[in-house]
Amino acid sequence: MNITFLGTSSGVPSLTRNVSSLALKLSQSAEVWLFDCGEGTQHQIMKSNIKSSQIKKIFITHMHGDHIYGLPGLLATLGLSGNSEGIEIYGPSELRSFINSALKSSFCKLSFPLHFVEVENFALKNKILFENNKIKVNCACLKHKIPAYGYRVSEKDKPGVFDIKKAESLKIAPGPIYSELQQGKKVVLPDGRTFDGKEFCGPPREGESFVYCTDTVFSESAVSLSKNADLLVHESTFSQTDERMAYEKLHSTTIMAAKTALLSNTKKLIITHLSPRYTNKNSITPGDLLKEAQKVFPNTHLAKDFLTAEIK
């Protein structure tokens, strides 16, 4: 899996950073999942390597405008293109009425179905939000001025590496049988021989995991959600020097994000959702924010618009 940042600014866009949105590309799939959709997200998608027609699920963290104002426009554009077969939208309970109202008021009729999933009960009861044979999604309540939710996407373990040489030495002809063996299935060859796929595969490979947490002040639930994750994307609206403001507005400082990564044993942290007050022309720069976080959690990286990062 990999992610592409489509917006990394907090509150309002700047000349170099749009407001919040992130695209997740799934492994061995053309499917894309979108996390938050601030104003201008569809323009950002056009400038990226993401195809809007591949978006199948949208996860919204909370109802502040810098995370949702791009949704009606994106959905309307997808409707005009006729490429979408339907989209699942996960988020707070108010999200359905916001989207339906915006579409109805602008006389927009979509050519595809929307399926809404309210996430609050899943977060409160620690229930799996979505699951198939390859992946599952969990969510958790964060700590912000309005209800906000973090999301975790976890791949299930993958089959071990297939030993082609062993198969060849046993004169098993290449073809669909190799795929069945790699999946650990038992197969019967035309000559009557029977093989168990487990004999040809190494130990299962651990699936990748990605966590997205914004908006929130430091939260123990974010730590729990991020436990042993490969990649945590966490908001860092404020510098540590503005910690008081962070508590007032219930946003995170760089240190809070780094502490979340450290306590959760996350492998890699990327900080995002930066306040526009921090620019290269001001006394505190985005580079300074990165250095603050790295003092607590060395494997920290700084998000920027259109940055693509592998989960592992």
Swiss-Prot record:
InterPro entries given in the database record: Metallo-B-lactamas, RibonucZ/Hydroxyglut_hydro, RNase_Z/BN
Catalytic activities: Endonucleolytic cleavage of RNA, removing extra 3' nucleotides from tRNA precursor, generating 3' termini of tRNAs. A 3'-hydroxy group is left at the tRNA terminus and a 5'-phosphoryl group is left at the trailer molecule
Entry binding sites for Zn(2+) 1: 62, 64, 144, 215
The organism's place on the tree of life at top rank: Bacteria
CDD domains: RNaseZ_ZiPD-like_MBL-fold (cd07717)
Free-text remark on how the cofactor is bound: Binds 2 Zn(2+) ions.
Keyword Nuclease among UniProt keywords: yes
Keyword Hydrolase: yes
Any one GO molecular-function label of the UniProt entry: zinc ion binding
Alphabetical UniProt keywords: Endonuclease, Hydrolase, Metal-binding, Nuclease, tRNA processing, Zinc
Active site: residue positions: 66 (proton acceptor)
Residue positions binding Zn(2+) 2: 66-67, 215, 273
Cofactor(s) needed: Zn(2+)
Entry's EC annotation: 3.1.26.11
Similarity comment text for this entry: Belongs to the RNase Z family.
Chain's role: Zinc phosphodiesterase, which displays some tRNA 3'-processing endonuclease activity. Probably involved in tRNA maturation, by removing a 3'-trailer from precursor tRNA.
Assembly behavior: Homodimer.
NCBIfam families per the UniProt record, alphabetical: PRK00055.1-3 (NF000801), RNase_Z (TIGR02651)
Name used for this protein in its record: Ribonuclease Z
Organism: Prochlorococcus marinus (strain AS9601)
Designated gene of the protein: rnz
